[in-house]
Amino acid sequence: MSENSTAENQLGTEPIGRLLVRMSLPMIISFFIQALYNIVDSIFVSRISENALTAVSLAFPMQMAAHAIAVGLSVGLNARVPEAIGAKDEIRANRIAGTAIFLSFVSMLVFMAAGFLFTTAVYKHQTDVAEIIDGGSAYLRILWTVSAGEFFGQLLEKMLLCAGCPLSAMLSQACGAVFNIIFDPLLIFGIGIFPRLGITGAAWATVGGQIAAALLALIMNLKHNHLIHLQPSDFRPDISSCKDVLSVGFPSMVTIGLSSLSNYLINQILLSYSTTATAVYGIWAKLQNFCYMPVFGMNNGMVPILSYNLSAHHPDRVKKTFHMAWVFILLLQVCLMVILECIPASLLSLFNASESMKAIGIQALHICLLSLPFGGMTIIMTTAMQSLRHSHYALIANILRQFINLYFFTALLSALTHDLSIVWRAVPIAELASFITAFLLMRSMFNHLHLSEDDAHRF
C-alpha cells in the first residue's frame, strides 16, 4: 500500500477516539506552548513599565489582524485539501495548497506596507502618552513588516496536518515558542552579548520565533509530506481554488478580524476609565487566549477528519468526531475556569501588577473567567460548521460572538452604569448569547446534513 493510501486510510478507518487524540494532542500541546510564550512576552514587558504593558495591550488587536488572515488561509487549506484527497483529486489538492501560499504572500506584502506607513498613526489615534506611542508603534512596526514567519508558518504547519503528520506540526510550533521564550529576556533586558532593546526586543523575539517555526515546518514538509506535491503551476491562482480556500477560511478571518476590531473598540471604552483598565483587559486577553489554545488545537485535529469523512460519505464518523471533541473541550474549559478562579491575585502578580491594577484586575478576572466554557463550545461548533460546508452559519455565529455581542454589551453596560465593575460582566453575557445562537445554528446544520433529531439533541 502506498504512503498516500495509508495516510488517507487513517482518516477514514482508524478508530475515532485514537485518531482524534493522535491528530489533536500534539497540536494542543504546541498551541499551549504558543500561548505560554504570548503570556511570557507580556510578563517580561511588564517589568519595563505599566505603560509598556499598555502599549503591548493596544498592539494586540493590530497584531491579530495579520494573524486573522494567516489563520483564515491556513484553515481553508486544512479543510479543503483533505476533502480533495478524500475525493481522490490530487490535482485539486495541490492547486488549493499553491493558491493558499500565493494569497499568503500577497497578504504579507500588504501588512509590510502597513507597518511602514500606519503604525504611529494607529497609536496616536488611541492615546496621547508619548511613551506608549513611541514604544507601541515601534513594537507593531516590527510585527507587521517582518510577518513572513506568521503567514507561511501557519500554512506549512497545516500542510503537515493534511498529510497526517501532527507530531511534525507540533515540533515546528514548539520550536518557535521556545525560541521566543529564550530570546525575550535576552533582547528586552540586554543580557550577555545581546543589546538592550526594551519593548522592541519582545517584537524581534516574536518574529524570530515565527520564522524559526516556519523554516522547521518547511523542512518537515520536504521530508514527510507525501500527499501534497507542488509544481510551479500550482502557485498561479485560479478562481475555483480561491473559492475553495476562502469559502472555509473567510469565516475564520472574520472571527479573528472582528475580535481585533472589538478589542480595539473596547480598549477605547476602557481608556475612558484608566490606562490601568486597558492593561488589565490586555492581561485577560492573553489569559483567554491561553485557555482557548486547546480548543484551537482540537480544531486543527478535528477539521481534516470531518472534511475527509464527509467527502468519503462516512456520516457516523463525522458525528462521533464532533461529539467527542465537543465533550472534551467542555470538560477542559470547566476545569480551567475552576482552577484560575482560585488564583486571580497570583496571575496578576506575574505581570508585576500594582495595587491599583490588582484592585481592578481581581474583580475583572473573577467575572471574565465565567465565559470560558461557553466560548470553548462555541468555537468548536463554528469550526465544525466550516468543515461541514456550512461556512455561512459559522460566519453568522462568529460575527455575533467576536464583534456584535461583545462590543454591544460592553458599550451598553458602560453607557448605562458608568461602573467598570459592571462593564466586565459583558464578557460572560456575550459568550452565553453567542453559545445559544451557535447551538441553534448547529441543530439546523445537522438537519441539512440529514442527521437525525436525536443526534442534534445529543450535542
Residue ranges and their predicted role:
Residues 1-24, 81-148, 194-250, 306-371, ...:
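Short alpha-helical transmembrane segments in multi-pass integral membrane proteins
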